[in-house]
Amino acid sequence: MSRSSDLFHKAQTIIPGGVNSPVRAFKGVGGEPVFFKSGKGAYLTDVDDKQYIDYVGSWGPLILGHCHPKVIEAVDNVLHSGMSFGAPTELEIQLAEKIASLMPSIEKIRMVNSGTEATMTAIRLARGFTNKNKFIKFNGCYHGHSDSLLVKAGSGLLTLGIPSTPGIPQCITEHTLTADFNNLEQVAQLFEKYPNDIATVILEPVPGNMGFILPKIEFLKGLRELCDQYNALLIFDEVMTGFRVGLHGAQGLFGIKPDITTLGKIIGGGMPVGALGGKREIMSFLAPEGPVYQAGTLSGNPLAMAAGLATLKEIEKINFFEDLSSTTNKLTEALSDAAENANIPLFAASLGGMFGFCFTDKNSVENYLDVASSDEVLFKKFFHAMLAQGVYFAPSMYEAGFVSSMHGDLEIQKTYDAAELVLNQLKSA
């Protein structure tokens, strides 16, 4: 028995399911999860001393790779001064100013501890500001695990095949309306049905928890217009896409300003973090300046602020995103070429340092159903065979993958060689 397997069995006796987040349990691919002990650059090492090229990157935060020296130095500099004070620090201001200077829609920002906190607070703020209760989300979009947002959600809920979750009363979700991603007509119909009741529309501008799906620009523009028409707020959940698809987020890339933006992952440089920001008059509705309450013991803690600030300073450097996008494109091209050589249909796409692929003969993937109809059995076989070759992809076909600045031509070539070997073996099996 491997040490990973031994640890997993031990973990199951004390931790529900043996993991502290469902997708880690490998339910989406079968088998037992790998336990890791260290990471450096583009690589992870497991507890059995096997090394892997890492395309998960802690689910997005590690855009600079594992243990980047600038991030380690920044954390070390504050570590010895105190890990948390429960009081304001100058680092909070510095990170807030840096984010606001880069994210087009943000004039004020509130730091929290996770993406879930950020989206939960954003919905509360939108309801308080508009004095309306209903909101629209999209089937398969995942916005964390707060009660009102766990309706037809993505991420681990898709892996487990659960459309919602027990433990949430109907009275909480009755104000949550859903539509299909990239379907503007459905959104318009909801606004027509509830013209005075919808506080906000929330979406991942580039979904990454129901597979990797690129938005139609007309869809995003249409959402902005509908929200303006019906006096509703538009929330971009950029926890995943913020500083991942481009220096100014998805909103900068597509030229569309939301009213509220939620952030996480990269702005903490690998530390637990979240944030929400937006127009000054909306953000001023948050306590203690306004009536909408939100609080957090560890919000703005020095370690996360230091790691996030160091990360943002690195990704600001000239050609950072040009190089990152080039590497990610090379990866998806390599996967596509390997599949084509094996005569196996595969769709792959990328944006910035974010990518996804699924085994389908479709020429485009536009919503959750397109991903769900792809070959999940083949994905599971491919995942495990690539893992055996030392390539670690997300253990679910519903999760996006991530490339860091530490991935280079060597890692792409190794991935291509492994994929070509694996896909040809699967084809002949």
UniProtKB/Swiss-Prot annotation:
Transmembrane segments: none annotated. Its cofactor is pyridoxal 5'-phosphate. It is found in: Cytoplasm. NCBIfam families: hemL, PRK00062.1. It comes from Legionella pneumophila (strain Lens). Keywords: Cytoplasm, Isomerase, Porphyrin biosynthesis, Pyridoxal phosphate. Its main location: cytoplasm. The lineage of its organism: Bacteria, Pseudomonadati, Pseudomonadota, Gammaproteobacteria, Legionellales. Pathway: Porphyrin-containing compound metabolism; protoporphyrin-IX biosynthesis; 5-aminolevulinate from L-glutamyl-tRNA(Glu): step 2/2. This is Glutamate-1-semialdehyde 2,1-aminomutase. One of its GO terms (cellular component) is cytoplasm. Belongs to the class-III pyridoxal-phosphate-dependent aminotransferase family. HemL subfamily. GO terms for molecular function: glutamate-1-semialdehyde 2,1-aminomutase activity; pyridoxal phosphate binding; transaminase activity. Disulfide bonds: none annotated. One of its GO terms (biological process) is protoporphyrinogen IX biosynthetic process. It catalyses: (S)-4-amino-5-oxopentanoate = 5-aminolevulinate. Pfam families: Aminotran_3. It comes from the Bacteria. The modification N6-(pyridoxal phosphate)lysine is found at residue 265. Its EC number is 5.4.3.8. Homodimer.
